[in-house]
Structure formats: C-alpha cells, structure tokens
Amino acid sequence: MSPQPPSPTSAPAGSLTHLAVAGYRSLQQLTLPLGVSPLGGQPHGGLTLVCGANGCGKSNLYRSLGLVAAAARGDLVAALAAEGGLPAVFWAGPERTTREMHRGEQPVQGSSGRREAARLRLGIAGETLSYAIELGYQSDDHTSAFVLDPEIKREWIWAGGPFHPRSLLVQRTGAVVERCGDGGRAVPIALEVSPHESLFTAASDPLEAPEVFQLRRTILSWRFYDSFRTDRQSPARSGRIATRTPSLAADGGDLAAAVQTILEIGDAEAFQAAIADAFPGCHLTVDTSAPLFQLQLHQPGLLRPLEVTELSDGTLRYLLVAAALFSPRLPPLLVLNEPENSLHPDLLAPLARLIAAVAERTQVWVVAHAETLITALEDGSDCRLLRLERELGATVLPGQTVLERAAWRWPA
C-alpha cells in the first residue's frame, strides 16, 4: 500500500515561486523557479527537485535558502561566520566574463579593479509577499578588528512576486526601516538599526509592520532536514525527555516523541502504511512507560521489537525522514538535503512515494544526488526538475530562457 499524504493540518498558503541568489559561493547570478504548492492552484506540484553532479552548487542553494531563514531568526551574521565569513562565501570568480572566456579562447581572469562593490544578495518571491536582502563589507571604521563582519546594506519586502516600485511595502536602507504608505510616502518605523540586525527583528510589530510580522512568521515555520546523524552517540539514538512533538527536530533527537504524536493526533494509518511500504510487515510503537520514550520497530519473525539503538543506520535514517514528512503540523516549506544518504537502493522507491505524497499537501524542496531517487520522483509525481551544471565555476540552469531569468528583478 502506497503512503497517503498526512491529513490533519493543511500547510499555509503563500508558496514560494522563485529563489534568487547573487554573489554567494558558486551562485554568481542565479534565479530558480520553484514548484508551487497545489493549494495555490498553480500548474506545478509542490515538489522542486534539485540535482546535478558533485560540485555543481546544489549544497550552495540549500545553504542560501537557510541564510534567508537565518535573517528571519536574527542570526544571519552568525550563520555567515560559521561558513567562514564574507571572504569565504563571496563569489570567487571574475566580476564579469567575456564571450571569449566562455568559448575557451581567453583565460578566465579578473580586471584590475572592481566596477561595483562586492555584494551578496538573497531573494525569495512568493505568491503574496516577496523579500530581498543585500549584504557587503563595512564601509567605515576600518580600525575595528571586526571590519570583515557582514553588514546589511538594504532590505525590501513587496507585495506579490515580480518586483515593481509600486508594490514596495517595507524597505531598509542603512540604519532606517521605512514602511511605504499610500502615494509612495515613506514612514520610518525603526531608526538606528544595527548593520548586523535584519528588519525582521528590528521592525516586526504586527500592528506597525504587519507585512514584516507575517513574512517572518512564515519563514520561521520553514523546516530544514540535512543528513540526520545515526552514529551511536547521535541525538536520534540517545533520545530526550518526551513532550508532545508536532514537528521533528532538525537533529532527530525527539524521534520517539514525534512518532507518538503522529500516532495520537496525526495520520497514524498512513504513517504505518509508509513504514510497511519500506519494510514489509513492519510497524512502529512507542514505549511511553518512562519519561524517556523508546521507539520500537516490530518485524515479522522476531519475538520482541527492536529498539532504536539496535537499528541499522539506513533504517533509522528512513524512520527519521518518515517522521519529518508525516508531521501533524506541516510547514509551508519543507527542505530535504540528500535524504537518500545511507539508504539501501531498495528504499529509494518507497522514499520517492513518501515525498510525492507529502508534496500534494505542501511545498517540498529536495536536493538529491541518487539517480534512482531522481527518476522515481520524476516518474511518480508532478515535480519541477532543476538539473544544475557549472560553467566557468558558476552554477547555471541549462536551457533557462531570458524570460525565465527575467521573472526575478532585484530591487534598486
């Protein structure tokens, strides 16, 4: 029996339509269309599948979306510092390339000086609200030891997808955040904002700036799952004191509580069907007799269930992905980075069916490397496939038309 999409809670409306990145690692200038949630009534399903050879920039896309979430949380500078700071994350290639460079007739080389200041730009376009941020080096105080810290130069929030000055709702320039009122009149709503603080934390009052509050709340509800640890000391095997858990933690440490929550208030029947689809004849229970819940996998032919400490890495990782996807509280965006890691090839078809089922209810972004999973998702679901390549060190989407690239416009 193939898994059915979880049913208790629908995802919020307002799906992403585009992700735009400029100046970040291999993403010199890239705009990607995203599969839109079927709740929005769009032609594409809710699944975006990003694939490509090693080194093509898949992980950079995953990280760039995570940086947008970090801006909403208020820890963007810390997130960039964890990646090595601006010197490590800026596009390392030339500011401009020539036709001769692309044809191999001229070596790739930079000019004697930059025409424009180095900038890192991130942007998301949504059905209802869109956002962009621009960061760069500090422009003054060169005596400080923190001169290489990222500085937020500008931010914008506007209505709808494609940017137009008349659709601008909130903008931040330097230390001032303004709300754009009727007739283009700008009203300051935050002054003396730190160059390291996003408008999401500086001006998120629901009455004074409802757009900021609404978009921040949406972004904070995104969920990212990247390479669950399954070693003997991993949080997923160690567990933690159980409380009701409508969303699995990013480290999987609350797996038993998350499964018990699914069994109590989620779609328990579909969840067990998904487990049986991957492991025929098996089902899950949770021992709730102690504050530290114990997950148990029942297998045909065994006289007792297996506890999480006894499971193989691949089995545990599949259970973690299943628990994340069957959350009773679906997010507006669910991002999975190479969920097929450490899984036996026989589990990839059930995994594809599980992902496709959840994409019927909310927007799902999958970064995948295994061709078996990619083919299964292509064949079994309505997905938008983005197969990336590298050209002169830059990540590109082959075949993208001028009109498709023009669907995103950076605010000025």
Q: Where do the protein language model's features map onto the residues?
A:
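The start of beta-strands in P-loop NTPase/AAA+ ATPase cores
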Residues: 46, 332-333
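C-terminal lobe/lid and adjacent interdomain/linker elements of RecA-like ASCE P-loop ATPase modules
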Residues: 2-15, 349-412
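Conserved ABC ATPase signature
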Residues: 260, 273-326, 333-334, 339-348, ...
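Conserved catalytic network of the ASCE P-loop NTPase/AAA+ motor domain
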Residues: 41-43, 113-114, 325-329, 356-360, ...
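Short, hydrophobic/aromatic-rich segments at coil-to-beta transitions
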Residues: 13-19, 113-122
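Electropositive, glycine-dotted interaction segments
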Residues: 119-265, 269, 273
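Catalytic acidic motif of RecA-like/P-loop NTPases
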Residues: 25, 66, 312, 340-341, ...
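Pre-Walker A-like glycine/lysine-rich segment at the N-terminus of P-loop NTPase domains
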Residues: 2-102
